[in-house]
């Protein structure tokens, strides 16, 4: 089991998942990538090494970490995936952020990068990359999504799940960040239920 954290997270979060996968070795991936083109190299190299040492490899990935994994890995490197609040359509998210920041495509193309007041820097290079590199994903996948996720809409995640034959579970009242006791209990139950299914 390889755990991939979200923004601001750490590989140490993998410890939490050890009790949920008692028969497996669980390790956290302490990646450095900030963009999908960096992740393409770093993730594929790391997972290739892990794959050479193990017959089966399962991915557990969170938020932006899930997006990097979706953008850089394939069924040759991963046998199964559990995605928690994944960013599955980065183009849509960037376009939403542009609206929040009142930035047009023309402005972004001219300035290349624009800092926002909500802590994100909009990048023309990033937007162009995700448009030119759509996600191709053929790994058996379970997705956990919070009803009130503020980064990805239910329509977007549902469309992704349908297109990629992923099993989607929606937590009523859930958020993008699963962190309360109730949310973590829901996550635990979701992982155990998905683990019982055979692909």
Model features per residue range: what roles?
Residues 1-34:
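Short, surface-exposed "cap/lid" segments of acyl-processing enzymes
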Residues 2-7, 60, 84, 144:
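Short hydrophobic segments within beta-strands
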Residues 11-18, 37-40, 154-158:
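Short, surface-exposed alpha-helical segments at coil->helix boundaries
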Residues 24, 54-57, 79, 139-140:
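Short coil/turn segments at beta-strand junctions that form active-site/ligand-binding loops
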Residues 28-51:
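Catalytic nucleophile-loop/oxyanion-hole region of alpha/beta-hydrolase
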Residues 60-69:
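Gly/Ala-rich beta-loop-alpha elbow adjacent to hydrolase catalytic centers
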Residues 72-73:
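Aromatic pocket-lining residues of Rossmann-like dinucleotide-binding sites
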Residues 77-159, 163-170, 174-199:
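The alpha/beta-hydrolase serine catalytic core
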């Amino acid at each position: 089991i390889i755990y991939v954290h979200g923004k601001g997270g750490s590989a140490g979060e993998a410890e939490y998942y050890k009790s949920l996968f008692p028969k497996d070795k669980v390790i956290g991936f302490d990646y450095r990538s900030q963009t999908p083109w960096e992740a393409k190299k770093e993730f594929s190299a790391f997972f290739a090494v892990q794959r050479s040492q193990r017959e089966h490899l399962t991915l557990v990935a969170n938020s932006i970490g899930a997006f990097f994994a979706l953008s850089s890995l394939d069924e040759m490197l991963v046998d199964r995936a559990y995605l928690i609040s994944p960013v599955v359509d980065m183009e849509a998210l960037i376009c939403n952020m542009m609206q929040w920041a009142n930035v047009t495509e023309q402005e972004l193309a001219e300035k290349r990068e624009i800092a926002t007041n909500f802590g994100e820097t909009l990048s023309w290079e990033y937007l162009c990359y995700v448009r030119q590199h759509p996600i191709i994903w053929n790994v058996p996948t379970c997705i956990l999504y919070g009803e009130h996720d503020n980064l990805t809409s239910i329509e977007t995640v549902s469309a992704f799940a349908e297109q990629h034959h992923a099993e989607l579970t929606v937590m009523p009242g859930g958020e993008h960040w699963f962190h309360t006791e109730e949310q973590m209990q829901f996550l635990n139950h979701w992982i155990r239920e998905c683990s019982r299914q055979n692909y």
